[in-house]
């Protein structure tokens, strides 16, 4: 039902502040789910299982992190038929993020700019929400995305990632280490060769220790930026293989404005997502695949607005895909279209 109605609702939603519309939609989606209306508003998607990172995904279309930062809306979002859902980014301590307004639509370009700044309620509240999810309890594949607090010095970033990893590990299908948001000062420095080598070494050791402790191996993936040159992609790919990291998510938002110059809000600070990042993010997927081969599976995200876009990510070397901005513009029909295009 929502597939048909979303185009009618969208003008009203787009008349609201972008962040207010975001919360309004999620709250009403969760309310409908709790009233037992999830089957009426969502998608029924046939299973098309893929095993990636040792995890069985019911279908290859997932929700990217950022839409549900606190894991508070998992059950409502699950009604869209995702093969997996990623929530976060979460940090050790609660933080408000950047001042509002901090999210902007560029409808002429099917794009968003955000400078949210990892606003979240902290990892303990996050875990409580995850544990309360019925969908997760019934076997839903849930990725938990972790980051560092804004006031943690970059030299101590590993402490924040370790703190979060230890707490989310028992509750995750996989864990994503976000080092690529442009909205936390100096965070992307962690993509540098020496910084990344040190961080991955630390996290891999912790993962092995936690696997022994919990008698369960939870894969760890790294989320990277699209704003990388060939040498940087090569260095990151080599580090992923060398440290036996389980997966990589390519990509986060871009700081480039080349594709949206002159549009309202184009010069707002933050990360640009949506259709304009498609080519750039797909290039990173393709280049990264040439470096890592089959050793490190890639989850492709960035600018997916159609089944053909999802197929292009897979053809470039991704094993799974994620959507976010396309969902805002197209609604849950996008999930159905992508799943159909990728059906084996």
Curated annotation (Swiss-Prot):
Cofactors demanded by this protein: FMN
Catalytic residues (positions): 181
Source species, domain of life: Bacteria
Record pathway: Pyrimidine metabolism; UMP biosynthesis via de novo pathway; orotate from (S)-dihydroorotate (quinone route): step 1/1
Keywords: Cell membrane, Flavoprotein, FMN, Membrane, Oxidoreductase, Pyrimidine biosynthesis
An example molecular function term from Gene Ontology annotations: dihydroorotate dehydrogenase (quinone) activity
Lipid bilayer topology: Peripheral membrane protein
Residues that coordinate or bind substrate: 69, 114-118, 178, 183, 252-253
Cofactor note: Binds 1 FMN per subunit.
Keyword Metal-binding belongs to the record: no
Binding site for FMN: 65-69, 89, 145, 178, 223, 251, 274, 303, 324-325
Biological process according to GO: 'de novo' pyrimidine nucleobase biosynthetic process; 'de novo' UMP biosynthetic process
Subcellular location: Cell membrane
EC number: 1.3.5.2
Gene Ontology CC: cytoplasm; plasma membrane
CDD domains reported for this sequence: DHOD_2_like
Catalytic reactions of this protein: (S)-dihydroorotate + a quinone = orotate + a quinol
HAMAP family linked: DHO_dh_type2 (MF_00225)
Subunit structure: Monomer.
Similarity comment: family membership: Belongs to the dihydroorotate dehydrogenase family. Type 2 subfamily.
Function according to Swiss-Prot or TrEMBL: Catalyzes the conversion of dihydroorotate to orotate with quinone as electron acceptor.
NCBIfam families, per database record: PRK05286.1-1 (NF003644), PRK05286.1-2 (NF003645), PRK05286.1-4 (NF003646), PRK05286.2-5 (NF003652), pyrD_sub2 (TIGR01036)
Entry protein name: Dihydroorotate dehydrogenase (quinone)
Organism of derivation: Cupriavidus pinatubonensis (strain JMP 134 / LMG 1197) (Cupriavidus necator (strain JMP 134))
Organismal lineage: Bacteria, Pseudomonadati, Pseudomonadota, Betaproteobacteria, Burkholderiales
